[in-house]
Regions:
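A polyanion-binding, active-site-adjacent surface
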Residues: 1-165, 174-175, 189, 199, ...
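Active-site metal-binding loops of divalent metal-dependent hydrolases
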Residues: 171, 194
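Short, aromatic/basic amphipathic alpha-helical patches
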Residues: 177-184
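Short hydrophobic/aromatic-enriched beta-strand-loop microsegments
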Residues: 184-193
Length: 225
């Protein structure tokens, strides 16, 4: 696939940060979880740096206990370098999501017995300014083939993990999950996105997320609090 202006650079962390991603899947993915939590695509200071969905550096290293070699994209944006474990910036969305998981479940093992976190699209799209451009804002001629490939990949993930339900983190992820899984019978719902671009999340994402989980039929019994 090729992507034109306003996109100037495309990163695929599954290539240059393959080792941490493989550790994440091998250590934490299991069949039959209560819910697959589905994000959209990598953020420039999260998965783009670590290879882990919502991969805020500190959370990945200190709570998930994942490390490993991280390379660089073949064509790196000068304003969005991949510094890997040395990235000084903290992704707010990842800090909120993994911070909630830590405080609610205590250990990764307890959390991943119930959930798994993945992204719908593995690619990060950057404009010349360094601004992140999400897949839904790509031109239709580029977007449609991308979505078709990501839909197929999502069906493969769901087939492998057999989650009881898929919860899109944000409306776009929910919509894509509904479209991709329409023929499978897997229930699809949503969680509010923890991004600071979501004003409601800035007023308190955790209670919103837990309300959405319960509404989707996910019990939080057995969590620490």
């Amino acid at each position: 696939m090729r992507f034109g202006a306003p996109v100037s650079h495309v990163y695929n962390p599954l290539v240059y940060a393959r080792a941490p991603f493989e550790t994440y899947v091998e250590r934490y993915a299991r069949r039959g979880v209560d819910a697959l939590l589905l994000g959209i695509n990598p953020g420039p200071f999260g998965m783009a740096q670590t290879g882990i969905p919502f991969g805020e550096v500190s959370a990945v290293r200190t709570w998930l206990r994942i490390d490993g070699r991280i390379g660089r994209p073949a064509d790196e944006h000068p304003r969005r370098p991949v510094l890997g474990w040395d990235c000084p910036r903290s992704e707010v969305s990842g800090r909120r999501l993994w911070g909630w998981a830590r405080d609610r479940f205590g250990t990764p093992q307890r959390f991943f017995r119930r959930f798994f976190v993945a992204n719908y699209c593995p690619l990060l799209f950057l404009e010349a300014s360094g601004r992140n451009r999400t897949p839904d804002r790509l031109p239709a001629s580029e977007r449609e083939p991308l979505l078709a490939a990501c839909d197929e990949a999502l069906r493969e993930v769901v087939g492998a993990l057999a989650p009881r339900r898929v919860l899109g983190i944000g409306r776009f992820a929910e919509a894509r999950a509904r479209a991709a899984l329409a023929a499978t019978g897997v229930p699809v719902g949503s969680l509010p996105h923890p991004s600071p671009a979501n004003p409601a999340a800035n007023r308190g994402w955790r209670p919103l997320a837990e309300t959405a989980l319960r509404a989707a039929g996910v019990s939080l019994d057995g969590a620490l609090r």
